[in-house]
């Protein structure tokens, strides 16, 4: 493939896709990623996964503070790219930048557009109980995920799949979809189909508070919520020990109880069952497997329960 490609991306998802392109000998003339960020509880700067991969392959790298900076835009022009590929870069790009490459900018979106436009399509699709996801490649315009569709593929969401697991599956197939798109751009056969605005939905970035579990819902819905916010921002609930204030309990792993009848009041702690802690939902129950009490280490849910002699019998 002779196309000159500039790649813009930041997290591990984008690094996985970039590796697929590099393994296929795509001519990546430059990489753009976000500026290094301080590590949590430390002043040490952490490089993005995309930066680490680019440096390991000796690919020219830019980390602009602002993508509207004239010096940055001038450097992009010097690379004389035929096409820009954007994958989870993390910034909405202005038209001046989109107009630089000969054939435009193409974005790999980890969702089936026009549904789930925004930063969290993977998480919100699972939280909504979705059973099918996929990648969409669009030719970018100045809107948020509003460009014409060039290619789509599909990935089934397994009944126990978390957002982390779906992200891995989408990244693995997304690189191949981009290779197909680049081949079509080079051959002049790529199609651009406008999105159906009537079908558009939004998927804004999740907050930590949205990880909170609402037990007054069917177990299937609660389980979908837990899977959708795992590993980030993470699911949590609250618990009380007598004489103490309510504390958060992170829920790292759970599974559905096979019997779907009524067990008790929503959030009621039904006790230990095998290795799990059984919690009632509005309909059905969930088995908590791994939890993390506030300020403590990760542990088995049954060990948490057995260590809480004064635990009130309800989560909220």
From Swiss-Prot:
Coiled coil residues, start to end: none
This protein's GO CC annotations: cytosol
Binding site for (6S)-5,6,7,8-tetrahydrofolate: 111-114
SUPFAM superfamilies attached to this UniProt entry: FMT C-terminal domain-like, Formyltransferase
Catalytic activity: L-methionyl-tRNA(fMet) + (6R)-10-formyltetrahydrofolate = N-formyl-L-methionyl-tRNA(fMet) + (6S)-5,6,7,8-tetrahydrofolate + H(+)
GO BP, one annotated term: conversion of methionyl-tRNA to N-formyl-methionyl-tRNA
Enzyme Commission designation: 2.1.2.9
InterPro entries in the cross-refs: Fmt (IPR005794), Formyl_trans_C (IPR005793), Formyl_trans_C_sf (IPR037022), Formyl_transf_N (IPR002376), Formyl_transf_N_sf (IPR036477), Formyl_transferase-like_C_sf (IPR011034), GART_AS (IPR001555), Met-tRNA-FMT_C (IPR044135)
Keyword Protein biosynthesis: yes
Domain of life of the source: Bacteria
One function term, GO molecular function aspect: methionyl-tRNA formyltransferase activity
UniProt keyword Transferase, yes or no: yes
Keywords: Protein biosynthesis, Transferase
Task performed by this protein: Attaches a formyl group to the free amino group of methionyl-tRNA(fMet). The formyl group appears to play a dual role in the initiator identity of N-formylmethionyl-tRNA by promoting its recognition by IF2 and preventing the misappropriation of this tRNA by the elongation apparatus.
Entries under NCBIfam families matching the protein: fmt
UniProt record similarity statement: Belongs to the Fmt family.
Name of this protein: Methionyl-tRNA formyltransferase
Organism annotation: Chlamydia trachomatis serovar D (strain ATCC VR-885 / DSM 19411 / UW-3/Cx)
């Amino acid at each position: 493939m002779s196309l000159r490609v500039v790649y813009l991306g930041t997290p591990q998802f984008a690094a996985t896709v970039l590796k697929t392109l590099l393994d296929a000998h795509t001519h990546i003339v430059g990489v753009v990623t976000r500026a290094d960020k301080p590590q949590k509880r430390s002043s040490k700067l952490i490089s993005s996964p995309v930066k680490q991969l680019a440096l390991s392959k000796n690919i020219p790298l830019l980390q602009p503070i602002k993508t509207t900076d004239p010096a940055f835009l001038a450097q992009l022009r010097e690379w004389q790219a035929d096409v820009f590929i954007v994958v989870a870069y993390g910034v909405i790009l202005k038209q001046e930048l989109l107009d630089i490459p000969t054939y435009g900018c193409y974005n790999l979106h980890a969702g089936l557009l026009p549904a789930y436009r925004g930063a969290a399509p993977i998480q919100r699709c699972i939280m909504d109980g979705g059973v099918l996801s996929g990648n969409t490649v669009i030719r970018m315009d100045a809107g948020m995920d509003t460009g014409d569709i060039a290619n789509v593929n599909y990935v089934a969401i397994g009944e126990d799949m978390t957002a982390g697991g779906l992200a891995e599956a989408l990244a693995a197939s997304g690189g191949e979809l981009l290779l197909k798109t680049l081949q079509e751009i080079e051959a002049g056969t790529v199609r651009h189909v406008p999105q159906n605005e009537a079908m558009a939905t939004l998927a804004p970035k999740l907050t930590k508070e949205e990880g909170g579990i609402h037990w007054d819902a069917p177990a299937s819905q609660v389980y979908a919520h837990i899977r959708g916010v795992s590993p980030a921002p993470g699911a949590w609930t609250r618990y009380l020990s007598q004489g103490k204030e309510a504390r958060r309990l992170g829920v790292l792993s759970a599974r559905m109880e096979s019997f779907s009848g009524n067990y008790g009041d929503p959030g009621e702690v039904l006790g230990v069952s095998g290795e799990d802690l059984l919690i009632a939902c509005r309909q059905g129950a969930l088995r908590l497997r791994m939890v993390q009490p506030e300020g403590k280490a990760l542990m088995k849910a049954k060990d948490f329960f057995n260590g809480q002699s004064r635990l009130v019998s309800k989560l909220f």
